[in-house]
Amino acid sequence: MASNSKKKDVGSQYKVLFTLGHGSFGTVKLACHLKTKALVAIKMVELSKKNIRGIRAEIATLEKLQHPNIICLFQVLVTSKHINIVTEYIPGGNLFDIIKEDGPMHEEEARRIFGQVVSAVKYCHNQDIVHQDIKAQNILRDEEGNVKIIDFGLAIRCRSGTLLKRQCGTKSCFAPELVLQEPYDGKKADVWSLGVLLYFITTGYYPFRGSTMKEMEEKIATGTYDIPTHVSGQLENLIHQILTVPPEMRPSIEDIERHPWVKKTEVNNPTVTDPDYNIIEMLCGMGFDANEILESLQRKKYNESMGAYLILKAQVDKGLEHTSIISAKPVDQCPTPPPSPPAHPSISSLLLKRRASEPNFSLLHIQPSGEHRPVSLALPGHKVARSASMPPIALHYPEKKSNSSSFALHSGAVAAPSVGNSILEDELPVPPDQEYDMGACFGSTYTKQCDMETPSPPQKISRFKRMSKRIRACLAQLCCIPRAPKTKKKHTSSNKIAP
């Protein structure tokens, strides 16, 4: 990072608007980039020795990932007290909130959305990166209806032939091998989480539910769930294939992409291209130096110059003309933010600290083959799910290639290595070898609070928030800015199945 980065604070480059989310590990703010007037999300993490290693690992992962369905890193700004990670702002909300408000998706829409998620996960797995916390809260939908995966706080680099031992992620999305505390293949665990996600977006609730944590874990370990009758045969087949208890029989991400139900997303893998000199010319008109911009891009500094370039490039990639990006916005005016802070638990979870707030219920080791399993009565309007020992339903599903490679037991996860020219190498001291309190599978077990049942509708807005919302609305009217139309929420029961 440029040597002058410490001399500048966030306020010199961004106008912070309000908080999107917060937690014990950091706070995510909605902000306006002063030079380009673009809205961004800034995650502010306290600069401390226990956080440095985790932040370095996560930033290195974000640097490595460039995919249209993965959150884009713009800049890393280090101040005397905080590390500020600037990413693109996705205003459409997360899939969890969307499903809770609008109900489950129609299959055609779910095919498109799930295909994009599969494409992004495949891109990560091809680089030996596993996410480890795939869930609806960590998938945002943009204004065009496309989705992006966020929150790579638990993402790790897994060498081929490595088994992981540390438990991390969200309990309701745990694979059986994690519940049983067995060494596991990170990619196969990601695949299981994709199955939970697919079930949720097409039914509106989780496949494994129980009145207690132990009951939920027992259902996960035995693969006990039911399928609503409205689910098509191909979708049912795909869910059964993914939620296969033995990990060695579980399909790979490539197998899932080839399934006839999945709508494959054609993505041109981004390649190193020459800088857009039209963007550089625009930045020079804002006071940036062309040579510094080129050097920052070449060395991947993710400093102020590179951040401004990436922010403008993101706007151009969305179809905005070079000349209209700046000319349509007065120099001293940022876009009007939403009338009230949007509910963005997924953004707030971006790199937020995991909490070890859930007890580990010890379960007997349940062999997935042949042993008697507890009987699960089907609810009215539901199909009885196949057990882990039942053969998969054949619906032109390609044979899964057997993986004969042996796995070496690994004592822990391998963190994504920092890039040689990482922006933090010259900015932050490297602490002595120690476990950092981030939940990146290096220390004790870290899990996010799981959703055992479909949560109840949000509580009523407080008087202060209502007053704040009215003030924002009045200001919007005074500025002659039309308010965004309200979307009517549909309060559906957690057990109600859409026809």
UniProtKB/Swiss-Prot annotation:
**Domain spans labelled UBA:** 274-314
Keywords assigned: ATP-binding, Kinase, Nucleotide-binding, Serine/threonine-protein kinase, Transferase
Binding residues for ATP: 20-28, 43
Broad class of enzyme this protein falls into: transferase
Q: Which SMART domains match?
A: S_TKc (SM00220), UBA (SM00165)
UniProt keyword Transport, yes or no: no
**Pfam family, any one:** Pkinase
The reaction(s) annotated as catalysed by this protein in its Swiss-Prot or TrEMBL entry are:
L-seryl-[protein] + ATP = O-phospho-L-seryl-[protein] + ADP + H(+); L-threonyl-[protein] + ATP = O-phospho-L-threonyl-[protein] + ADP + H(+)
The Protein kinase domain extends over 14-262
Question: Is Transferase given among the entry's keywords?
Answer: yes
Active-site residues from the entry: 133
Stated EC number for the protein is 2.7.11.1
* Recorded GO MF terms: ATP binding; protein serine kinase activity; protein serine/threonine kinase activity
- Spell out the InterPro entries in the cross-references: Kinase-like_dom_sf, Prot_kinase_dom, Protein_kinase_ATP_BS, UBA
Q: Which SUPFAM superfamilies match?
A: Protein kinase-like (PK-like) (SSF56112)
Biological function: May play a role in sperm motility, especially in the regulation of flagellar function.
Which family would the database say this protein is a member of? Answer: Belongs to the protein kinase superfamily. CAMK Ser/Thr protein kinase family. Smok subfamily.
Q: Know the name of this protein?
A: Putative sperm motility kinase W
The species this protein was found in: Mus musculus (Mouse)
